[in-house]
A protein has these predicted regions:
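Phosphate/pyrophosphate-binding catalytic cores of soluble transferases and nucleic-acid-acting enzymes
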Residues: 1-252
């Protein structure tokens, strides 16, 4: 987005801090704020005021965990997380290396389970009065078809060149930005491990899997309002319904 070097780490706590400043600025100008995106962790952390312990990071511990992952894979680390924090491990996909390592780091540095953050957030009053709208499809095959079309559009819009430019400049570091679906599946293609068609199919598959996880995540949001695109005859009707909900919320 032009404000962060993609080779530098960028955490959810960084996002919450930056987003909070932008929201304050928009409110100061007498405007309403719309947050648009699909990452449940980031949305919840901002809107629900999830607390972040300042002293929960340790570069040496994180480095050791990353070295263990490089040597032995994710399975031993995930097993350790399940032993330290079964509840927290249940909410993290075992293939999400970054979050597994972060959760372990938190447990080891603070001596508390990573899942305690979410529980603590319930005792903290959020500074925002937000209304969450979730857009999906009732028919799963329709959703998957739209995901496949979206991936094709990403390539038409220049994803391949964007990822290749990054690869040539930085290689394949493990920062958050390049762990995003669409980047990480292309790096093996650049290294000659498989074809472009295989890379594209991997992106589609991983996006479908991610969509399933996000549906599960947002179903846990008790105050979320769901809008299903296949309930409407035309996109304009869907947009009108969303506008009505937003307008009613801002007028309250």
């Amino acid at each position: 987005m032009g404000f962060q070097d993609p080779a530098e780490p960028f955490s959810v706590s960084d996002y919450v801090a930056l987003a909070g400043k932008v929201i304050e600025d928009i409110h100061a100008r007498g405007k309403n704020v719309l947050l648009v995106g699909g990452t449940g962790l980031y949305a919840r952390s901002l809107l629900k005021a999830v607390p972040f312990t300042e002293n929960s990071r340790d570069d040496e511990i994180r480095g050791n965990l990353e070295a263990e992952f490089a040597a032995d894979g994710i399975e031993p680390l995930y097993a350790r997380l399940k032993a330290l924090d079964p509840e927290g491990a249940e909410g993290i996909h075992p293939n999400n290396t970054r979050r597994v390592i972060r959760a372990l780091e938190y447990c080891m540095v603070t001596g508390e389970p990573f899942s305690k953050q979410a529980k603590d957030s319930k005792a903290v009053k959020s500074p925002y009065d937000g209304k969450m709208l979730v857009l999906s499809f009732r028919d799963r095959e329709t959703l998957y078809g739209r995901i496949n079309l979206r991936v094709e559009q990403m390539f038409a819009d220049g994803l391949l060149k964007e990822a290749e430019d990054y690869f040539k400049r930085y290689g394949t570091p493990g920062q958050t930005s390049v762990q995003a679906i669409g980047y990480k599946e292309l790096f093996p293609y650049f290294e000659g491990q498989y074809s472009l068609d295989e890379a594209k199919e991997n992106i589609k598959r991983e996006t479908r899997r991610y969509a399933k996880r996000q549906l599960t995540w947002f179903r846990r949001e008790e105050d979320a309002v769901w809008l299903f695109a296949d309930d409407f005859d035309a996109p304009a009707d869907l947009i009108s319904a969303a506008e009505d909900i937003a307008r009613a919320h801002f007028e309250d």
